[in-house]
From Swiss-Prot:
Residues 1-32 form a transit peptide. This is Ornithine aminotransferase, mitochondrial. The modification N6-(pyridoxal phosphate)lysine is found at K293. One of its GO terms (biological process) is response to salt stress. Its cofactor is pyridoxal 5'-phosphate. It comes from Oryza sativa subsp. japonica. Induction: Up-regulated by SNAC2. Also induced by high-salinity, heat, and submergence. Strongly induced by abscisic acid (ABA) and auxin (IAA), and slightly induced by brassinosteroid (BR) and jasmonic acid (JA). Homotetramer.
Amino acid sequence: MAAALARRGGGGLARALARGRGMCSATAAERAAGAALTSEELMRMERERSAHNYHPIPVVFSKGEGSHILDPEGNKYIDFLSAYSAVNQGHCHPKVLRALKEQAERLTLSSRAFYNDKFPIFAEYLTSMFGYEMMLPMNTGAEGVETAIKLVRKWGYEKKKIPKNEALIVSCCGCFHGRTLGVISMSCDNDATRGFGPLVPGHLKVDFGDTDGLEKIFKDHGERICGFLFEPIQGEAGVIIPPDGYLKAVRDLCSRHNILMIADEIQTGIARTGKMLACDWENIRPDVVILGKALGAGVVPVSAVLADKDIMLCIKPGEHGSTFGGNPLASAVAVASLKVVTDEGLVERAAKLGQEFRDQLQKVQQRFPQIIREVRGRGLLNAVDLSNEALSPASAYDICIKLKERGVLAKPTHDTIIRLAPPLSISPEELAEASKAFSDVLEHDLPQLQKQIKKTESAAEKQSCDRCGRDLY
């Protein structure tokens, strides 16, 4: 086939195919001979052969165990991102890997065209743990959000009797729910939306934490609103915690206006914030909960939507599905992942260690009050908010590069915020090591960075959201 294509496509295609075969053969030969690739070689290969849709910290993960990462050269790091909270249980948890191995040797995929002997157990375990009547399995977090939106719209038409094609979803400014087209249609991130239009209609925006604004939208449009989608703590926005009582007020407003309360717990759920769900901080029960990330412990992608029968059974056979959703491999891994959370007391551990970590970071803030504006978080989902004026012309990304050089891996969210979310298995000593590294970077590295980096006007420019006009972080 390749030869035929080459003949039809002319010499250019033939040469391209030849180059491709040559490169593949060389790489295959190197690997067959056991030649180890360096971090630099691997990063170069990714830059040349993969889409540039990420701006990663320049470190290559080669092996992970607990809260530790090794690169190909054997350098050891402490992970303070946890794959955006997907590895709450720690990298390569032995109990989860055991479940993976045992199931992989039996059956990996059936599709939902047939039953398998693992998904029903997962469904029963998950719904019992979180107190909902039913669940709908998917794979990625974005799929979970899309599923929830479809489900809530269907409920709106069937149960609330919203006129055809007029259902609305309300979401929050600064939200992050994924990268699919339906989800970015709610986004305030210009990078996520520019150049990808037209966006999907049927969305209204409100400021996060603004109950008065939410009530006004509900009063003005309530007959057509089927759901309010929110993060209990906004992760990508910079670990933004709502005012006390906000979630209870939202619960009351949704109940009063017959609007479904949809909690995106993909990043905040599964013990990350010191509660099993972040909504538990105010003891409220959403109508719909979306889970993902740590549901698969970083081993396989697993997501799920939880709801009661009155909502979930609005979806009929053939109206929604996923080839891999509910597969036996993911189901076995998810049950093992949840058991690790309960058996190892990760909820309590996150609450205790999170408070200790914030105490340490606040001591660093006391040393550098002109640089650190705020330390905030719940459990082991935390952020350090830096002053743009004190940091300039450096950025949070530059700080993360220096943290990496001191053995701590973290990622910025926006130009001045650093999210710190290690695996919940991390030790108190490792938290103290990271706090010291942060202090050392501000004391020793930042002054040198500010001398080396040339100040540019563009770095100081403010941006506003294309959708709602609000200032971006």
